[in-house]
Amino acid sequence: MPPSAHWGKRPRSGDSEEAFVRFSELSPAAKMERRREERGEKKERERTLAYFKSVQRALEEHGSGGGDAGALASIVDGFFSELLKLLKADSTFYVLRNGTACRVIELALTSALLLHVKSLLYVFLGHICDLMVSPVASFTLETLLAALSQGLSALGETNPEGLVAELTEGGVGTHVGSGVPSSATLVRSMADELCERAEDLIVHDIGGRALRSVVMMLGGRAIRQAPQPPHPVAFPDVLGTLAEAIMKALEDGYGREYNTANAAESWMAAVQAPATSLVVQSLLRVSDEGSVVDRCVRQRIEALSYKGKPLLHHLLVDPLGCHVFQSYVQVPPPAAVVEAGDMAAARATAAASPSVSSAAKASANEASTAEEFKGKEEGELLVPGGADSCCWSRAAELVLLEVDNLLKPGSDLVAQTGYVLQDLVLYAPATLHLQWLWRRLLSPRLLLLFDVPALTAVLVQAVKRCAFEGVLLRPTGLAAQLRDAAGSDAVSTATAAAEAQNEVSHHGTVLPADVLSMLRKEAALHVRYSPVPIAFQSAVCARVCELAKQRAAKGAAQYLLVDGALSEKGHEVARYLMHLHPSASKLLQHSLDKLQREDLVAVVCHQKGSQFMQQYIKVAALATPTSAATAGDNAGDAKGPLMRLFRRLQSSLSTLIYDKYAAFMVETLYECASLGVKEALVKALVPIYQDMRKLSPSAGVAGAPAASEDGVEHAPQEPATAEEGEAAGNAEVASPSPTQQRFIAYKVMSRCCVEQYVHRKEDWTKLALRQCQVQQLLRRMLLSE
């Protein structure tokens, strides 16, 4: 481990030249002088700490909106001036041993200018390794690197020439008169210090964590849970130098420590140490094709063999080495592999008919799609493009050969194999690879995915990967299109809602807030949802529903939502199946009609069951003809899925409107339904509303909670976005109080415009008709995107 003799024990000036003398052996005058010095140092430390605390209060006050930007900039600038003076005057950096001082520096770095960040890093040079192993200062160094990355990203947006100057090693950067060199020069000097002590850092718990942050920052990735910069800035040359030093330290250090016979044994010893293993995983995550990191880490792993088998095989079957294998799976594939896979998927989609209506046509399309990547590989176990095409292909082929041994009864490797399979699903380079993985690995072992709880998450990820295929995580053009389409009040309201909520559409429906948040987090981890043909989506849904029907007489809905065989994962599988293309999830939609009414009510009153039902209502509304949506007495509307759902739940409405989960479903039903279903629902709610008025005459829809209270219990606009709030409310174990239940019920009445229907029916009809027209306009626009 790195020596820490000078860290935590401040050497006094002249200690190295003077012989050690006990305090008791000093003369009375020397004792008085020593005590006077200690009192002075203590007072100085107290004054310094008081200054840091005052800066902290000022920064927190301005951070909460209590001051203007100019005052905040002045505070930060003055603080860094004092901090740099303090650090330059004390070569031991004694102040950085205080946790409060370090937290204040981290807080100031969030509002610091690029010059402040560079100046602080410039002062740190020469002490980087000591800071890396410090329990508190290491976090400050990580925050400093994150601020440097954010500052360079912002500079690239406003001043591209300045960014080029900052990335020039040996240059002066953009701050010519400051005496601080360019960012690339500072980062290179920092990396040189780390290379000298790499052998010590990779085995140090704190130093290893800080070293991972350095690796991620040099690779252009976010660290310390900071948001990913819009224009990441990487230092590939510096990263390559550091990676070479780390790999040399790994093989030499562990080889010397364990007296290993070859480099492969050193690797196997290294992956048993969590600190070293995590550093290797970080290097794999920032490995790009053709880079130095790719050559010295990824290619090195592939080239080594141990006991007659590839090193990758031993990493797969090792409980700790499996984590390195997962990071190997996540290595970004070459652009050529991704492009070829997308082109094959595009050809399959173009060959398919616009509407997949018959099972025979779906099977034919699936067969033709499979034929594209089977070809000469028929009867072989080769992955698309061959095992050498990318890391994912090599790992998938190895897993296919070993999966039966890994998943055999009594194996201790089932759980870790489940995590590997999840990564294979999520990080499949293209649809071509995902189809191969489903056909060769997952579909033949679907029984295991159903029966083994540790593997059920693999099924969830596979369905999710198909459901959100090709999703674009950007605001839809909904608001702009609506603004140009018409100028009515209803359209203006919809436009404002779309702009405020930053919605994203997929398969004709707006993605719920919790799903959108999940997808954004996965996108930050470089998970790519490539386009998936509808035929393949249909095949996945049919296979899951077929197996579920064998276990439940009433079909997949009964097995996934009611029987609880898959626990909470069953609701997730069902919900993601409902996010497939509407024509691909027909089997699950039809199985919902077979549920008993009591079971359907139980599903609606469950949190994840309510989320599933909300998505089902949105999908079912897509099948409603335009004429039926605006005609209250249309004969076809009476046989529609939403009317059937309403009739089955009509007798339970007096209970459902008081349930915090079922209430969202009722609101979604009113919002998405056609005019006939809207009126039938409101008519059923009128007697309940009148009874509520009789029980509490002073209460009413006008007494519904305000917007601030609304945000706690329900989302103010789209019911689907309320799922994010419900996830937070799920922590409450106790059932809602009577006051909360009345709040929920009046919220439902308000959203369904029951009071308006009672007193001004003509106005309600006009409003409902306008809502139906807007819904149809929204669906057409979403489907056209």
Locations of regions flagged by a protein language model:
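Eukaryotic gene-expression regulator signature that favors modular helical reader/repeat domains
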Residues: 2-785
